[in-house]
Regions:
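Iron-sulfur cluster-binding electron-transfer modules in prokaryotic oxidoreductases
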Residues: 1-293
Length: 293
């Protein structure tokens, strides 16, 4: 097993309020795998919500967290695709633009901080796949799923823009699918796998948001899967809460529950469903335990 795996945790602002089970299941899974998360109390929001209102504030928010992680000599781990994409993009801009770096560092210096571009930003899936490795995860698996079919949904910000995030091939990614199949489940191909879940439109045009979600869910159902599986809090909220919304509003019975990847992997690692918060999902996903060997 890989030793001394410590990362600074960039929390998602959404999860403590709307998706606490993602935090608790991630903590349980990483503890089981020997990965240590360090809470840097001074961390702020990644700045994603500010991108289109105040670009400099957006840059400063991410740069501050990057500088704080640098001070601790820790790479940043996040399980939020929006945090991941934002921090990766800002890290890229700050490394490339000397004048921007100088301007932001002048502000950071008021707190005794400095950005030097020395640390990396990593998604939870990236750490599991690249840093820990499939073989090391398999050693910890104690139960596997039988005949369970899963539709993986990567989410937009983890894959694009490719030249900045450098996570996987954005047109034909495999990392998430390989991680899912460690559990014994089968990752089933489906045509709309890489399309947006509809989350960015929620609150702007709810009907369009629900249309995008419903189209994806109907396509996934046609592939014969039992569950969706995601690793982004906003995508999970869309497939869980918003799916419930359109099932009610549109009088539909064609539901497809969604699981967080940490819930799926956690069950294979022998963690109980209560700790993983499966009962906290809006749509009932507790039946997944019936597929465990």
């Amino acid at each position: 097993m890989v030793e001394n795996m410590r990362y600074a945790l960039q929390r998602c602002c959404t999860t403590p309020v709307f998706l606490n089970q993602y935090e608790t299941s991630t903590d349980a899974v990483l503890t089981k795998l020997g990965i240590v998360l360090v809470d840097i109390k001074e961390f702020n929001c990644c700045g994603y919500p500010l991108k289109n209102t105040s670009f400099k504030a957006h840059i400063l928010s991410s740069s501050r967290n990057l500088a704080l992680a640098e001070r601790e000599e820790l790479a940043i781990l996040t399980f939020c695709n929006c945090c991941y994409g934002t921090l990766k993009h800002v890290n890229h801009l700050m490394r490339d633009d000397a004048s921007l770096r100088k301007e932001i560092n002048e502000t950071l210096s008021k707190e005794g901080l400095k950005y030097d571009g020395k640390i990396e930003v990593k998604h939870l899936l990236e750490i599991l796949y690249k840093d820990l490795g499939l073989a090391n995860i398999r050693e910890k698996v104690v139960r596997t799923f039988q005949d369970l079919k899963i539709a993986t949904h990567y989410g937009c910000h983890i894959l694009r823009p490719r030249q900045i995030v450098q996570f996987d091939n954005p047109l034909a990614p495999t990392i998430f699918d390989e991680l899912v199949e460690i559990t014994g489940a089968t990752s089933v191909p489906w045509s709309k796998k890489l399309e947006c879940c509809g989350s960015p439109m929620l609150g702007i045009d709810d009907e369009l948001s629900m249309d995008l979600t419903q189209t994806k869910i109907e396509d996934a159902r046609k592939s014969g899967v039992h569950y969706l599986c995601v690793a982004c809090p906003y995508c999970q909220l869309q497939f869980d809460r918003v799916q419930r919304m359109f099932l009610t509003r549109r009088h539909s019975n064609h539901q497809l529950p969604s699981l967080l990847f940490t819930q799926l992997l956690g069950l294979s690692l022998g963690i109980d469903s209560e700790t993983l918060g499966i009962d906290q999902n809006e749509l009932d996903a507790k039946g997944v335990t019936k597929f465990l060997s």
